Structures are given as C-alpha cells and as structure tokens.
Amino acid sequence: MGLSWTVPLEWGKNHSTTNPLGFFPDHQLDPAFRANTRNPDWDHNPNKDHWTEANKVGVGAFGPGFTPPHGGLLGWSPQAQGMLKTLPADPPPASTNRQSGRQPTPITPPLRDTHPQAMQWNSTTFHQALQDPRVRGLYFPAGGSSSGTVNPVPTTASLISSIFSRIGDPAPNMEGITSGFLGPLLVLQAGFFLLTKILTIPQSLDSWWTSLNFLGGAPVCLGQNSQSPTSNHSPTSCPPICPGYRWMCLRRFIIFLFILLLCLIFLLVLLGYQGMLPVCPLIPGSSTTSTGPCRTCTTLAQGTSMFPSCCCSKPSDGNCTCIPIPSSWAFGKFLWEWASARFSWLSLLVPFVQWFAGLSPTVWLSVIWMMWYWGPSLYNILSPFIPLLPIFFCLWVYI
C-alpha cells in the first residue's frame, strides 16, 4: 500500500515553480509584494526570479558565489544585492543672503519681558504661591516648616536675601577670594626666592674658601695637570672626572654642616630667650644639677609660669624641687655657668666684658668708623649669609 501526498494549492499562487512554500530561491521576501502570503500580487510581480536563472552564480556584496542574480532572501532591489550606488547630491540652492560670516547676536530682551515672575517678588501673588510647600521648598533651605504655613516675613529685603542664600549670590565678593589666594602665592614666591638664594650659599662659601689658597691670583683647579687632564676651570665647579671633584664635595659637605649648626644655635638662642627650653639654672651652692632618677615634681615651683618647669634639685628626703625656667637667656646662662664650672679661666673674661659694655660713646663711634672702613671686605665675607637673615627674622617674630 503506497502513500501519496500532494501539496495543497493554497500554499502559493505561483504554481509554475517547484518551491510552493516560497522561501528560496524563487520567491521574494520583499515586503513590498508581501511574499509567502496569499496576496495574489505575487503573480503580478515583474521582478520575480525564474528558476532557470537561479542556477547561475553571481558576484555580490557577500563575496564571489554567495549572492545569486535574483534578490534572494533580502529582496530584488540593488541595495539588497549589495550593489550600492552613490548618487551625487543636488547642490544646495544659492543663498539669497548676500552677507557672509557670523551674524551679530541679537540683543537680549529685558528681564521684565522674559521672566515676568522675577519682577513680582513684592506682589501678593508671589506670597500666596509660597503657601504651597512644594514652592516653598524651592526658595527656603531644607528643614524648614513644611506644614503649609509661612512665617511672617519682616521685610522684602530679608526674603530676597534668603532666596539668594539658596540659589547663590550672582555677584560674589571677588576681593575676598583674591586675597585668600594672594597670601599663599606671595609666601610661596618668597620661599622659592629664598631657596634659590640659600642654594647659592655653599658655592659662595666654597669660592671664598678656595680663594684663601690663591692670594693675589685667580683660583685654578690643581687637578688639571694630573693623570686625568681637563680644561681650565674653577675649583668650585670641578667635573666628576677631575681629581678635585671629591675635595669640592667634601668642602661643600662641611659648609652644609656649618650652616645647619649655625641655624641650630640661632634656634636654641631664640627658644632660650623666650623661656621655652627646659633648661634649669644652677642652684646656688651646687656645682651641678641633679636630674637623675628624679622624674616628677613633688614640690611645685614657686609662682605661676606659662612655660614648663623642671626638676633641678634632689634633697636628701628624695623629693624633687621644681624651679621655673627663666624667662630670658636661659640657655645662654646655662652654657655660661656650665662652662665656668669646668673652665675656671673663663671667669677672667667677665671684667673685660663688663669694661667693653661700659665704654664711652667715643669708643663706639670709633668702632663704627672702623666697620665702615672695613665694610666692603666684610660684606664680601658675610654676603653668602645674607639670605639667612630673613629666615632668622621670621623665626624671631613668629616663635
């Protein structure tokens, strides 16, 4: 018993082809003709492909041998077959405006025309609109009353000021902003200037140091006649290949240590003058201070002082006695008393210092004249230290 099956005629109107379902390659999927539907327009499609041409291999946008000459699945149009044609666009019409270039910006209308609501802050309608909590939240900071009632506004100026505090002042105070930036910029510029000057101190002192070895002549590096000859140069600027380079580095290292020691001495003198150093003067009748195991004061210092006190004596009962730090020259007095206790010959200098301090004005004028006469040479010696004077002055004022 054999089975037979026939294709219903309703599957397609073009019954002359062997593919009644209309998927490929003889039926179009172009929506313009509603392919694979019951629309009888398919039979009237002049661009439908023929089965005999479907066996031909064509070249399209997808490579050789992949796109048949008929439209295939994408349709029969040239764009669907990958053959895109660029048509020249029509030139734009000639402008009737004879003026070229950017036209001027029109004048902005006044505020009363563009934003009439902004001119009605004093009106009754504006105050009535503020009764709405949603409108009130736009003009007053968060956290205010949201019950729908508006607190009585004393003046219109306060209302406008509160609105500006919410949305920002349209004309900020640029003077305060400028002064806030100008101060740090000036400090930064002054600090950079002092830094550049301070960096020249080692080289200046190095030049002065080496000039002591070449009295009456120009300083010349002695390493140029050694095993590694170099061109004539100053001993303060030796290249790394010069044998004098290591001596130049050693001299500048000593100079840096000397400058640091000088700054430390000045800082200690300044702190000692202001009474901020925990230095105790010697107790009368004792040669040294006793600060060994004594850590805390059981007997407070006499009087009140804003500066810290120190434990200077240790009586036999084991209690420490706190002595307040002197208000001025504590460090200098401590060093002098410490040196006098160990070097007795320093006490012989006291009368000379007292005599020098009691000289007549005539002697002081003579000293000033001598300094004026020898001033240029002293200036050449002390000029490298001039950049340190502003730093010492700032420390003296602000500490």
Swiss-Prot record:
Subcellular location: Virion membrane
Annotated stretches, region: Pre-S2: 119-173
Transmembrane segments: 181-201, 253-273, 348-368, 375-397
Listed Polar residues bias regions: 95-105
Keyword terms: Acetylation, Caveolin-mediated endocytosis of virus by host, Fusion of virus membrane with host endosomal membrane, Fusion of virus membrane with host membrane, Glycoprotein, Host-virus interaction, Lipoprotein, Membrane, Myristate, Transmembrane, Transmembrane helix, Viral attachment to host cell, Viral envelope protein, Viral penetration into host cytoplasm, Virion, Virus endocytosis by host, Virus entry into host cell
GO cellular component terms, A-Z: membrane; viral envelope; virion membrane
GO biological process terms on file: caveolin-mediated endocytosis of virus by host cell; fusion of virus membrane with host endosome membrane; virion attachment to host cell
Location of region: Pre-S: 2-173
Intravirion side stretches: 2-252, 202-252, 369-374
Residue ranges, annotated region (Pre-S1): 2-118
Keyword Membrane: yes
InterPro entries in the cross-refs: HBV_HBSAG (IPR000349)
Topological region Virion surface: 2-180, 274-347, 398-399
Post-translational modifications: Isoform M is N-terminally acetylated by host at a ratio of 90%, and N-glycosylated by host at the pre-S2 region.
Positions of the UniProt region annotated as Disordered: 85-109
Glycan attachment positions: N319
Superkingdom of the source species: Viruses
Applied relevance: Systematic vaccination of individuals at risk of exposure to the virus has been the main method of controlling the morbidity and mortality associated with hepatitis B. The first hepatitis B vaccine was manufactured by the purification and inactivation of HBsAg obtained from the plasma of chronic hepatitis B virus carriers. The vaccine is now produced by recombinant DNA techniques and expression of the S isoform in yeast cells. The pre-S region do not seem to induce strong enough antigenic response.
Lipidation (N-myristoyl glycine): G2
HAMAP family: HBV_HBSAG (MF_04075)
Role summary: The large envelope protein exists in two topological conformations, one which is termed 'external' or Le-HBsAg and the other 'internal' or Li-HBsAg. In its external conformation the protein attaches the virus to cell receptors and thereby initiating infection. This interaction determines the species specificity and liver tropism. This attachment induces virion internalization predominantly through caveolin-mediated endocytosis. The large envelope protein also assures fusion between virion membrane and endosomal membrane. The middle envelope protein plays an important role in the budding of the virion. It is involved in the induction of budding in a nucleocapsid independent way. In this process the majority of envelope proteins bud to form subviral lipoprotein particles of 22 nm of diameter that do not contain a nucleocapsid.
Sequence similarity: Belongs to the orthohepadnavirus major surface antigen family.
Domain writeup: The large envelope protein is synthesized with the pre-S region at the cytosolic side of the endoplasmic reticulum and, hence will be within the virion after budding. Therefore the pre-S region is not N-glycosylated. Later a post-translational translocation of N-terminal pre-S and TM1 domains occur in about 50% of proteins at the virion surface. These molecules change their topology by an unknown mechanism, resulting in exposure of pre-S region at virion surface.
Name of the protein described by the UniProt record: Large envelope protein
Organism: Hepatitis B virus genotype E (isolate Cote d'Ivoire/ABI-129/2003)
